[in-house]
């Protein structure tokens, strides 16, 4: 009796590496990973996990660095509207503050360490997700405009979570991670920088509102000009098959004939590619400008101010809405001050200016 023993295949690291690379970059996977995904997936998971834990159970944080901790978690008595991950303490400033830099876990939590962990992992994750969009588009032979459009919210998040704290000198000035915290950040930003009077913010508003208008216009016109392949007793959606190559609506009927007669011929559109490009470009460019505005105001290049009232030839104040706006900004600024129980000097000095 003889026994035949086959020789085992030797371990080859390079063959294993080639298989791993093919799996990472394969477009046949249910979820595309890609090389950017190797970094974006774990960082976003880490940020999400830490955010959920901090949102539910993080202890109070000394955000202003004056030993007056702020309670932001659900277990401290907040609800879903008021709860937030409180930014890192002003005592830490812009220092990198990982867990191993603190003397204890309690100290790390008290100084708001989770905020830095969440923000930095989140920013790495969303920038790599942008790269992942480009990578998948490249491998499928598509053009890169999906990644370009996604760059707008990524830049906006980076401006309020990283650039603004850098410009102001502390992560404590960053956006709190919560609903009420977001509105607190907006009001404080208006009081300190008068963002509503910044031209870049105005362009951002025009872009977002214009994009919303075009989206509703396009959607309603498409839904109104669907091609019917069924009789009147069946739903018009019954004649549609997923992935069909035939057109499903009449672009010229809605965007050219209808708009051209409803408004003026100049507003009519005959080129659906140009219209779809405008639909994507308008909000994207608008958010780019808004993010650039936040980045400029991070270094105190603020919006247009009206610190000096309009005077007549005799030196008397001419009442205007600018005075009301200026006083409102001053009120927001002093209410944002950490020691608000002390009467602010900015309101106790100078001549009173009646606004009504």
UniProtKB/Swiss-Prot annotation:
Compartments in which it is found: Cellular thylakoid membrane
Keyword terms of this UniProt record: Calcium, Chlorophyll, Chromophore, Electron transport, Herbicide resistance, Iron, Magnesium, Manganese, Membrane, Metal-binding, Oxidoreductase, Photosynthesis, Photosystem II, Thylakoid, Transmembrane, Transmembrane helix, Transport
Residues reported to bind chlorophyll a ChlzD1: 121
Chief location of this protein within or outside the cell: membrane
Short name of any one Pfam family annotated for the protein: Photo_RC
BP-aspect Gene Ontology terms: photosynthetic electron transport in photosystem II; response to herbicide
Binding site for [CaMn4O5] cluster: 173, 192, 336
Site (Stabilizes free radical intermediate) location in chain: 193
Membrane-topology descriptor: Multi-pass membrane protein
Residues annotated for chlorophyll a PD1 binding in this entry: 201
Cofactor annotation comment: The D1/D2 heterodimer binds P680, chlorophylls that are the primary electron donor of PSII, and subsequent electron acceptors. It shares a non-heme iron and each subunit binds pheophytin, quinone, additional chlorophylls, carotenoids and lipids. D1 provides most of the ligands for the Mn4-Ca-O5 cluster of the oxygen-evolving complex (OEC). There is also a Cl(-1) ion associated with D1 and D2, which is required for oxygen evolution. The PSII complex binds additional chlorophylls, carotenoids and specific lipids.
SUPFAM superfamilies: Bacterial photosystem II reaction centre, L and M subunits (SSF81483)
Any one of the GO CC terms: photosystem II
Gene3D superfamilies xref list: Photosystem II protein D1-like (1.20.85.10)
Name of protein: Photosystem II protein D1 4
Native organism: Trichormus variabilis (strain ATCC 29413 / PCC 7937) (Anabaena variabilis)
């Amino acid at each position: 009796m003889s026994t035949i023993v086959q020789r085992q295949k030797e371990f080859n690291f390079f063959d294993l590496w080639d298989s791993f690379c093919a799996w990472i970059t394969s477009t046949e996977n249910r979820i595309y990973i890609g090389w950017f995904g190797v970094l974006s997936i774990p960082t976003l998971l880490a940020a999400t996990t830490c955010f959920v834990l901090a949102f539910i159970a993080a202890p109070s944080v000394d955000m202003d660095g004056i030993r007056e901790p702020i309670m932001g978690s659900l277990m401290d008595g907040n609800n879903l509207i008021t709860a937030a991950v409180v930014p890192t303490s002003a005592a830490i400033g812009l220092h990198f503050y990982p867990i191993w830099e603190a003397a204890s876990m309690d100290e790390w939590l008290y100084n708001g360490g989770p905020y830095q962990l969440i923000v930095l992992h989140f920013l790495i994750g969303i920038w790599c997700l942008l790269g992942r969009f480009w990578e998948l588009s490249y491998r499928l032979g598509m053009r890169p405009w999906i990644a370009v459009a996604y760059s707008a919210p990524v830049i906006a998040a980076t401006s309020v979570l990283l650039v603004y704290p850098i410009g102001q000198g502390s992560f404590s000035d960053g956006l709190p991670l919560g609903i009420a915290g977001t509105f607190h950040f907006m009001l404080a930003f208006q009081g300190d920088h008068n963002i509503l009077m910044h031209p870049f913010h105005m362009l951002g508003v025009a872009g977002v509102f214009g994009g919303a208008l075009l989206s509703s216009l396009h959607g309603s016109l498409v839904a109104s000009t669907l091609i019917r392949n069924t009789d009147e007793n069946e739903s018009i959606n019954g004649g549609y098959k997923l992935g069909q190559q035939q057109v499903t609506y009449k672009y010229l009927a809605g965007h050219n004939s209808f708009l051209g007669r409803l408004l003026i011929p100049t507003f009519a559109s005959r080129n659906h590619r140009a219209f779809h490009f405008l639909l994507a470009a308008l909000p994207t460019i608008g958010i780019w400008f808004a993010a650039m505005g936040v980045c400029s105001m991070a270094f105190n290049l603020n919006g247009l101010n009206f610190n000096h009232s309009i005077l007549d030839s005799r030196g008397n104040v001419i009442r205007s809405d600018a005075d009301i706006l200026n006083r409102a900004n001053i009120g927001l600024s002093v209410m944002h001050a950490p020691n608000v129980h002390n009467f602010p000097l900015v309101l106790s000095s100078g001549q009173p200016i009646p606004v009504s």
